[in-house]
Amino acid sequence: MFTVRLGIAFELVGVAGIGVVVGPGTAWWATVPVLFVYGLGVGLATAQLTGVVLAEVPVANSGQGSGTQSTSRQVGSASGIAILGTVLFSTLGTQLSRKLAGIPGIPAGQRTAIVTAVKQSAGAAIAHLAADPRTAPVAAMAKDAFSEATRLAAFCAAFFLALGLLASLSLGRGSASGQTPRIPATDRKTAGPAA
């Protein structure tokens, strides 16, 4: 269980690091150290997860335990993507709309079109805006809004990782009596000889 906790801690540091490092002018190489730490954490936590989950499951029920673990992992991944995607794109839209509202001379319809283009392209439209000198100031605002949205999404992910780390502290302590759980007689036949 220690390896899983260590992995989650590395993931937490890596994701929070993204929130700290990312900015409108951040070079790609500046994210490499925190992404490395995050990747190390994923490797440590994910590789051990099935074994940790199945450690307390009787051999006869290992298929159910493995299936439950796999389903929980898939539901968690899908929920995380949905939540963080919503945070990212709603923050991007809100921040960019607010910034564009401060520029006189841009009609509301055009502001909406810019925000929609940036959101629907997941930021790819920013490069097109930056290429035209007339829209370069808008591109700078869009970069800033995208950075703010990315930071908030990263800190939200770090929050959920912190919850996971705290929850993991309640696991792996053995039974309430402090004794190692015993394999019932019906499970001993399928568990194989004792070592």
Predicted segment positions?
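Transmembrane-helix exit segments and adjacent C-terminal regions of multi-pass membrane proteins
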Residues: L40, G51, T112-A195
